[in-house]
Amino acid sequence: MDFLDTIVRRNPSLIQTAVSMHQRNELPANSVVVDLDMVEENAVKILDAAAGRGIHLYFMTKQFGRNPEICRTLNNVGIDKAVAVDLEDGICLQKNGIRVGHIGHLVQIPKASIRYVLSSMAPEVITVFSYEKALQISEVAKDLGIVQNLLIRVVGKGDFFYPFQFGGIEEEDLLETVGKICKLPSVRVVGVVSFPCFRFDVKARKTMPMPNLFTLKRTVKTLEKELGLRITQINAPGDSSAQMMDQFRELGVTHVEPGNAFTGTTPWHAFEDLPEKPAWLYLSEISHIDGDNAYAIGGGLMSGDSPMGIWSTLYHNHRLNALSGDNVDSILRRKILAERSGYIDYYGTLYGNREVEFSVGDSVIYGLRNQVFVSRANVAIVKGIQSHKPVLLGIFDRLGNPIETSFFGR
């Protein structure tokens, strides 16, 4: 499943602007093009829905390449802290003056970097998967003369985790392990976390709570009753769009971590028009033609969420499409069948049809759910699309660093 039809229907100006700017050599191929005004509109909807229900937000940045323009926009809306999914995330955010609220989940902080994280980032909370990691943090925090708040990653029987994301403190070992952590100096257990706590159900066509969430709720009761802890954070990320805030409140969630919701590309957005509108696309161009097929320059195709978990069903049941052409007036009608690319995505295959004739240099538009942090894609930030006065604010790499635009003919 891709988001192309949704973009055509709900934000056609984004497509037309991307094609126009690409054909004028203002946007390079292999770029995730971001409609910054739409991101801002989406963020306002998410924050308003969350604040009205007592839900706190940490914004996730990996999917849009830790982009500083987007981060500052989210800050200006009123979402003041980010979540760093790994150390690299945290470094990028801290370098750009973005406050890190949460780090250590999904990826634990390497021991050699704990001092840097505590002294330079000063995160609100750090997630630990084990007593040993809590001990490492305790030793550094004590040396720095601070008290660091911790979240406990808990694993219950029957919980669901995506491949290569396993680990945490087993529920049956909870009291023993957390009891030991509570005796450490300079750390304080304030909450629990898991992922995914919510996941899109293809049959129900809506996002539903996962067993992980109920493990967290049991854990909170146990820690408060047996250890006398005051748990202030039940961090339950997973498809955190504005539509979900009522459910979060009803289920006792205190913190969530929206990411793809800001660009209108959670799984639910592929099936239903939620409050957030699509705010990005993937732009390429035809490199060459071979028989009836054309080949689009790659670099970001593989980052369109690899087929695992929820996406395996969608990938098997739906084909990928694209738009191709050089004319703004006709581009929305020039739909073609495309092929997904492998990990080394030099090119993406485009299949010809009777209605669309390929030309080298034509723009190619995909509607992907990108994960820029694991790609070679550029990130192009454009403001003014909705007012039909587009301005390119900059082109960035996956780390949020500006790229010299002379490389692209500007």
Model-derived features: where do they sit?
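Aromatic/hydrophobic pocket-lining residues that form π-stacking "cages" and hydrophobic walls in ligand
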Residues: 46, 137, 216
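C-terminal accessory subdomain/extension
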Residues: 294-296, 300-410
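Active-site loop/helix belt of alpha/beta enzymes
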Residues: 156-274
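Soluble or luminal CAZymes and related metallo-dependent hydrolases
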Residues: 38, 42, 129, 173, ...
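Active-site loop ensemble at the mouth of alpha/beta enzyme cores that anchors a bound cofactor
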Residues: 242-321
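Active-site-proximal beta-alpha core segment in soluble small-molecule metabolic enzymes
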Residues: 56-201
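Structural beta-strand/beta-sheet cores of well-ordered domains, especially the beta-sheet scaffolds
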Residues: 124, 148, 185, 232, ...
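A charged N-terminal "starter" segment
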Residues: 1-113, 400-410
